[in-house]
A protein has these predicted regions:
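Surface-exposed, low-hydrophobicity beta-strand/loop segments enriched in small/polar/acidic residues
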Residues: 1-166
């Protein structure tokens, strides 16, 4: 999978240890969708150049703690929001409550980003045990935007398992 480093929202970033369904905390920080090209918040800019863009959230370290569920969201906002702060702006995507047992290392959430009025910044946020009562002690994710969501897995000899010569 090709990953553009300027479209990386979280690189093995630690999950926030609190938050609720109405107070999601940013994971990894915000990325500037407009960069230094001076476009501003122009909703007519096609960020994907006519092709679908995908948000990929990948669990790298299994969440641990007394939490029962976790919730991931994506937001767009006119201002940058730092990691650990409450997410703000327009919600683009929500996973809904996910049981901790369903978040093993390597689990990926892949969603086609909607056509929307994107503000300048994009962020991924999360909330530990959004139903209340639990906390998260550890847990990490990668999150990025890509056009290539092929779920390719390398092998030790770099030869696909379907190659008849192996």
């Amino acid at each position: 999978m090709l990953i553009d480093s300027s479209l990386e929202l979280a690189d093995n970033a630690t999950l926030p240890t609190s938050g609720t369904l109405t107070n999601n905390l940013v994971i990894g920080g915000s990325i500037d969708l407009r960069g230094t090209i001076g476009i501003g918040d122009n909703a007519t800019v096609d960020l994907s150049a006519g092709e679908p863009l995908y948000l990929v959230i990948e669990v790298t370290t299994i969440p641990a703690g007394s939490l029962a569920t976790y919730n991931f969201t994506a937001f767009t906002h006119t201002a940058s929001v730092d990691a650990g702060d409450a997410a703000a702006g327009t919600e683009l995507f929500r996973t809904g409550l996910i049981a901790k047992a369903l978040l093993p290392a390597g689990k990926r959430f892949i969603v086609s980003l909607p056509e929307a009025d994107y503000a300048r910044y994009l962020m991924v946020a999360g909330a530990a045990n959004a139903t209340g009562g639990g906390v998260i002690d550890t847990g990490n994710i990668n999150a990025f935007i890509t056009k290539d969501v092929t779920n390719w897995t390398g092998t030790a000899d770099r030869v696909p398992a379907t190659d008849p010569t192996t």
